[in-house]
Regions:
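N-terminal secretory signal peptides that target proteins for export/translocation
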Residues: 1-7
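Bacterial N-terminal signal peptides
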Residues: 10-21
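Non-globular targeting/processing and membrane-anchoring segments
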Residues: 27-111, 124-125, 225-456
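A short beta-strand-turn-helix
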Residues: 37, 115-129, 135
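Short, solvent-exposed loop/turn and secondary-structure capping segments
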Residues: 62-66, 108, 134-135, 141-148, ...
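Thioredoxin-like thiol-disulfide oxidoreductase module
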Residues: 113-124, 150-213, 226-231, 378-391, ...
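Short active-site neighborhood of thiol/selenol oxidoreductases, capturing the structured segment around
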Residues: 126-143, 171
């Protein structure tokens, strides 16, 4: 029998058997589907996973509950390689990824929408804001961009982060473009495959899909939670009736702009304090701390007649953060990040996921988990997270605060995202090569080594 014919017969059989998976009221029997999604074969399991996906977060919850015993055993399993060889565990992992639309979802157990309109409907129904991730590649692919892979390890697998995301936000992701991949063939059977370039950003949106803020790149779990809790409160404060425009009455202060004004205040005070405790020149740090904060621009809006005259002046005369930037350059970002290192902690869930990812192939970090090898990898990763947290907050997030403060954050998420990728991440939409193909570089290869066509 031809493979295609066999597949059609299997699918037909599953369709005929589908009524058995329905409850008395005609709705899906999630418990039955949860079993079929893992223990079923071929098209049967695929259809069960699709039905659980269509059921929304309840489908994912049913899948986790039905296989709670296996999930709990995996949490205490000390041999990642033996666990990976378990057929039922592999099937459960694939089911969790398919239903939640995220790779490594056994560690996070989160449900992600891939349709923003569906996410907005869920947010309105649940009275929650939306956390919308923009990334290169797809979140449910192993080879999504590096930052999104780090999110899956550092953030989504973290118990505190995943609980906050599950309880307080509706989750959504959208790919900006495919992620570049590079393969290095050493010619002796060894191949190294990685992604290169690309960045990711989490946006917090109100239930109507309007941006409230963006958290660019990787943050430590503690900092990520703190930022999201503050934005959850802002979403509640700024919420209006479903479908209502976000309008600020004359004499009132826009809560979103006020939030970003105060966030800039806190950021600059914190920056100056970190510099002073890191050995930066005190006069430069204090000079940065003494600079005028943006609250005056908010205050000017309280009187409309004054606003038209004063806002252009305030915008032109507002001093920048040069002293803070200069002091940071003098001591180095690594020294500043070292102050944050004690707060960068990976919990048990993140460490378990890291353990499964550490390469143990012959000739490549063999026995990396023995003799303290994994500890060294974890410590190096923690330092990298601390550096990313400091740079992303003080460089990128600072600019995003300014955009919102000056009213250019806008209600259009796509326009905001295009600006983030063009001006902050330096990967604009109009550069199909993401800066990897300079026009003035000679490669001594036919066509510059460029090939076009679908990815194999």
């Amino acid at each position: 029998m031809a493979p295609k014919t066999a597949t059609r017969i299997a699918v037909t059989h599953c369709l005929l058997a589908l009524p058995a998976a329905l409850g008395c009221g005609g709705g899906p029997d999630l418990q039955h589907l949860a079993q079929e999604a893992v223990l079923g074969t071929g098209a049967q399991a695929e259809m069960a996973r699709a039905a659980l996906r269509a059921a929304g977060p309840a489908g994912l919850e049913a899948l986790c509950e039905a296989h709670r015993g296996l999930l709990e055993r995996a949490e205490t399993h000390r041999d990642p390689e033996r666990l990976a060889d378990d057929a039922e565990w592999r099937s459960l992992g694939a089911a969790l990824d398919a239903v939640g639309r995220a790779r490594d979802n056994h560690a996070a157990r989160l449900y992600w929408h891939t349709d923003l309109e569906a996410a907005k409907a869920a947010a309105r129904a649940g009275g929650k804001p939306i956390l919308s991730l923009r990334l290169l590649g797809n979140l449910d692919d192993e080879f999504s961009c590096a930052n999104s892979r780090f999110f899956r390890t550092v953030l989504y697998a973290n118990a505190d982060v995943s609980r906050l995301l599950r309880d307080e936000f509706v989750l959504h992701w959208q790919s900006v473009r495919p992620v570049p991949r590079v393969t290095i063939d050493f010619g002796d059977g060894r191949v190294l495959e990685r992604t290169i370039t690309g960045n990711s950003i989490h946006y917090v949106l109100d239930a109507e899909g309007r941006p409230l803020d963006g958290l660019p790149g990787l943050y430590s779990p503690a900092e990520f939670v703190a930022q999201l809790r503050a934005l959850r409160a802002l979403a509640t404060q700024s919420a209006g009736p479903p479908g209502a425009l976000r309008i600020v009455r004359l004499g009132e202060v826009d809560p979103v702009r006020a939030y970003h004004a105060e966030a800039l205040n806190r950021l600059r005070r914190r920056w100056a304090g970190q510099l002073m405790t890191s050995g930066a020149p005190v006069e430069l740090a204090l000079s940065g701390l003494a600079r005028g904060f943006p609250r005056a621009e908010i205050a000017a809006e309280r009187a409309f007649s004054k606003m038209r005259a004063e806002l252009p002046i305030l915008g032109a005369t507002r001093l920048d953060d040069w002293p803070l930037e200069h002091a940071t350059e003098q001591i180095g970002w690594e020294r500043l990040a070292a102050r944050l290192l004690p707060d960068v902690q990976l919990d048990a869930g993140s460490l378990r996921l890291m353990r499964t990812k550490v390469a143990a192939a012959s000739g490549c970090r063999t026995d990396a988990m023995a003799g303290g090898g994994l500890d060294a990898i974890v410590e190096s990763f923690r330092r990298s997270i601390a550096l990313d947290t400091v740079r992303n907050e003080l460089l990128f997030h600072r600019e995003i605060h300014k955009w919102f403060l000056h009213g250019v954050g806008g209600d259009d998420l796509d326009l905001l995202n295009a600006r983030v990728y063009a001006e902050l991440f330096l990967t604009p939409d109009d550069d199909p090569w993401l800066g990897l193909l300079p026009a003035d570089v000679y490669a001594a290869l036919p066509g510059g080594g460029v090939r076009t066509g679908p990815r194999p």
